[in-house]
Design a protein with these regions (language model features):
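Single, function-defining residue in the core of a domain
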Residues: 1-58, 64, 72, 79-84, ...
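A short, well-structured juxtamembrane/interface segment
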Residues: 98-106
Length: 452
């Protein structure tokens, strides 16, 4: 059968290969309480076909039997896929990811630390009542004129590009509402990189309680003053807390120009993603480091960047290294682009909540498999993993046969400082946006006698 990924990647001789073998799939289904009769489309064959479908760009179910060389209909495959328990697929993903992460544990260390990236994103899906109710749709769209959209939070290992964990939720759900579920995936001493959304007092306090570190861009609402011995305001402390313009942190020491150690006071307001009890249990102050630097490129505006970090030692973690680390945060955007654009996960096809979650699970498994191919190619070809073409690795994995040896993959040219304007040259066909449900528009066409 085409698409036997376990046999294709067996040449890598790594522990995670075994988690894709037939016995592992059967064990995952049994542990999920799934019962079946061995037919043409048992769970082993269905999982392999599902993975093949994703690797080929989430093609239509009718096309998958042709890809797999199976004499079954597309509807039979779709029904078999629906019978797969979500828990079994999640177990496969979890076990594979755990074994993969162990293989790349020391890949891409930053000053001796493992580096992880966190970011939020979204994906669209079919317009069904069940999906609308569970996920919701973007504001400004009338009922029947938009599509349900899910929000998801992703944790990515910098050195390998593996998706370590993903949490999905309703569109209007705060990114921080699920961030604490990411922390158990990290170990003491790991460093988490994120944008302004993750630089809140509550999140930093939760990180520090687990001996984790963070490097985040400071929120615009954070008042920063690098003047030594400057005055400050203590939230909730009478007149002291009601002095606008004063930082809500106490200056402790200078770590260099535009670089300081401060005592950050816990705000009075309880964030919506924490309970009052959890908020009260956080420490009243946090000792953090705040620094500022500029990014200047010829022909561009100067950007001012203010970072907030728990890495306090200026000798071990100089300002330029912290700025360099924060610049690596863009890696997570590249990973999301590969998953959503290259692999075509931007719009999922299933019609139920469980089906969408299965689809997402298989996308993550397929993505991590491609990432391991990239890492193996980088090792064999003697180049950094970021130089190996992701799409070339995807194409090889999708079309390889058992026994095929991994060839030399395309190496991306080094183009430091390269940038392109975010515009499209090819003009799309212009159609008006749907502002009324389809049934209403059809009635309008009939009334105007414009229907064919």
């Amino acid at each position: 059968m085409k698409g036997n990924i376990a046999r294709i990647v067996a040449q890598f001789k790594q522990s995670w290969n075994k988690e894709l073998e037939d016995d592992a799939i059967v064990r995952a289904c049994q542990e999920a309480g799934h019962q079946w009769r061995e037919r043409e489309l048992g769970p082993v064959a269905t999982v392999k076909m599902f993975l093949l479908q994703i690797l080929f760009g989430n093609v239509a179910c009718e096309f998958v039997p042709h890809l797999a060389g199976k004499d079954v209909t597309g509807s039979a495959y779709c029904a078999a896929r629906g019978r797969l328990p979500l828990a079994a697929l999640q177990s496969l993903l979890s076990r594979c990811t755990t074994k993969m992460a162990a293989c790349v544990r020391d890949t891409g260390l930053w000053l001796g630390h493992r580096l992880f990236l966190i970011d939020g994103s979204g994906f669209s899906m079919s317009d069904t009542p069940a999906l609308q109710k569970h996920f919701g749709q973007p504001p400004g769209q009338a009922a029947g004129c938009g599509f349900p959209t899910a929000h998801w939070l992703a944790l990515v290992h910098f050195g390998s590009g593996l998706f370590q964990k993903v949490i999905t939720g309703a569109l209007r759900k705060s990114e921080l509402s699920g961030v604490s579920q990411m922390h158990p995936e990290l170990e003491a001493g790991d460093v988490l990189l994120g944008d302004r959304a993750f630089s809140s007092y509550g999140h930093v306090a939760l990180l520090m309680s687990r001996s984790l570190h963070g490097i985040f861009r400071a929120r615009a609402t954070l008042i920063v003053d690098f003047t030594p011995g400057r005055p400050h305001a203590i939230p909730g402390k009478g007149k002291s807390g009601c002095q606008p313009g004063r930082p809500r942190s106490k200056w402790i020491s200078s770590a260099g120009p535009l670089d300081q150690i401060v005592e950050w006071f816990r705000p009075v307001e309880v964030p919506a993603w924490l309970t009052a009890e959890d908020w009260a249990s956080l420490p009243a102050t946090l000792r953090i480091r705040v620094l500022r630097y500029t990014i200047a490129r010829p022909g561009f505006r100067v950007h001012l960047v203010t970072l907030l970090t728990t890495l306090l030692d200026p000798e071990r973690y100089p300002q330029e290294k912290l700025a360099e680390a924060y610049g690596l945060r863009w890696t997570v955007e590249t990973c999301l682009k590969h998953l959503k654009t290259t692999m075509k996960m931007d719009v999922l096809r299933c019609l139920t909540v469980c089906g969408v979650q299965k689809e997402l699970t298989m996308f993550l498994l397929a993505y991590n498999l491609v990432r391991m191919v990239v890492l193996e190619a980088a090792r064999c070809q003697g180049v950094p993993p970021e130089r190996i073409s992701f799409i070339d690795a995807l194409r090889w994995l999708a079309t390889a046969q058992p026994g095929d040896v991994l060839p030399n993959l395309v190496i991306i040219s080094q183009r430091p400082g390269r940038f392109e304007p975010r515009v499209r040259k090819r003009r799309p066909k212009v159609f008006p946006l749907m502002k009324n449900p389809r049934a209403v528009l059809k009635q309008a066409l009939l009334a105007q006698q414009l229907a064919p």
